[in-house]
A protein has these predicted regions:
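A compositional/biophysical signature of low hydrophobicity enriched in polar/charged and small residues
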Residues: 1-160
Length: 160
């Protein structure tokens, strides 16, 4: 793995001259490596990690288990890509187990997510079934704990 990529994955927001200093590289080498990582679609971008409860007032997120029928040519890929192109879809993954795709969606409210699932996702040819799970609370996001340690350990003592 590229040392520049490893430094990015550690989560610090650094300028190229800071990265060069940490890695013992020339700044132009770091810039060149970042350009290569972008060109090769290894580095797709980066975004700040935030606490959804503090930023997204009414945003509703859901995890959807989707069973799909693989196609003779291309298996799951064509249908998975079609589903992934919807604006509501934040992430999608091919899974092993009881369902084929794990789709994470976001909407402005519960109704918009429900409408997306019932009218747009479930009606696609090849989608056999969906199971939607609404996210109620986030405890960890992108390796960052979102809940204060004191609150997490405030549980009643268990008496024998």
């Amino acid at each position: 793995m590229s040392s520049v990529l490893q430094l990015l994955l550690e989560g610090e927001c650094l300028e190229t001259h800071q990265m060069a200093e940490i890695l013992g590289m020339d700044e132009t080498e770091v810039e060149s490596e970042l350009a290569r990582l972008r060109d090769e679609k290894v580095l797709l971008g980066w975004r700040p990690v935030f606490n959804p409860a503090e930023v997204e007032d009414d945003l509703v997120r859901a995890v959807i288990e989707v069973k799909i029928s693989p196609e003779r040519e291309g298996g799951f890929d064509r249908l998975a890509l079609r589903i992934s192109r919807f604006d509501e879809v934040e992430s999608s993954y091919l899974m092993s187990g009881g369902y084929d795709l794990l789709v994470i969606v976001a909407g402005k409210n519960l109704r918009s997510v429900a409408t997306f699932v019932s009218e747009r996702l479930a009606t696609i040819d090849g989608v056999l079934s969906t199971s939607t799970h609404f996210l109620l609370r986030a405890y960890k996001e992108q390796r960052h704990l979102l809940v204060e340690e004191a609150a997490a350990s405030d549980k009643p003592a268990v008496s024998p």
